Amino acid sequence: MTISAQVIDTIVEWIDDNLNQPLRIDDIARHAGYSKWHLQRLFMQYKGESLGRYVRERKLKLAARDLLDTDQKVYDICLKYGFDSQQTFTRIFTRTFNLPPGAYRKEKHGRTH
């Protein structure tokens, strides 16, 4: 494994451990000790997706799980994963899952209960 691949694996682990934080690309790059441009190029090279997309999709998957597994309010889940606002969270969630968070919870609960 190359040093660059090890760096990306370490960063992925750190990201996964800190998904409840805002996690701006600048912050991730600073943690890695790379410029954001270089880190984004490395990430794309080794993971095949952008760093921003990886962080967003990981947060959304965890939020979707929380919608199904907890009774937490959508607003609380939005804050838990560091989204700037419930409006932003709802827009991105809806784009990803084709349903707003509340409807996603109702539809998926209807299928499992």
Curated annotation (Swiss-Prot):
GO CC annotations on file: cytosol
Domain HTH araC/xylS-type intervals: 9-107
Inducing stimuli: Chlorpromazine activates expression. Indole activates expression.
Name of one Pfam family that matches: HTH_18
SS bond list: none
Molecular-function annotations in GO: bacterial-type RNA polymerase holo enzyme binding; DNA-binding transcription factor activity; sequence-specific DNA binding
NCBIfam families: ramA_TF
Further remarks about this protein from its record: Overexpression of ramA in the SL1344 strain confers multidrug resistance and also tolerance of both hexane and cyclohexane.
Protein name: Transcriptional regulator RamA
SMART domains per record: HTH_ARAC
PROSITE patterns in the cross-refs: HTH_ARAC_FAMILY_1, HTH_ARAC_FAMILY_2
General function of this protein: Transcriptional regulator. Binds to regulatory regions of target genes, including efflux pump operon acrAB and outer membrane protein gene tolC. Represses transcription of genes belonging to the flagellar regulon, including flhD, flhB and fliC; probably thereby leading to repression of motility. Represses expression of the flhDC operon in a post-transcriptional manner. Activates expression of acrAB, perhaps thereby conferring multidrug resistance. Involved in indole- and bile-mediated regulation of acrAB; binding of bile to RamA may contribute to activation of expression of acrAB.
Deletion consequences: Deletion reduces transcription of various genes, including acrB, porins ompC and ompX, and some pathogenicity island genes including invF, sipC, sopB and ssrA, in the SL1344 strain. Reduces growth in the presence of various phenothiazines, including amitriptyline, chlorpromazine, sanguinarine, and thioridazine. Intolerance of hexane. No significant effect on adherence of mutant SL1344 strain to mouse-derived macrophages.
Keywords from the named record: DNA-binding, Repressor, Transcription, Transcription regulation, Virulence
Residue ranges of the annotated DNA-binding region, renumbered to this chain: 26-47, 74-97
Organism: Salmonella typhimurium (strain LT2 / SGSC1412 / ATCC 700720)
SUPFAM superfamilies linked: Homeodomain-like (SSF46689)
Swiss-Prot/TrEMBL GO biological process terms: regulation of DNA-templated transcription
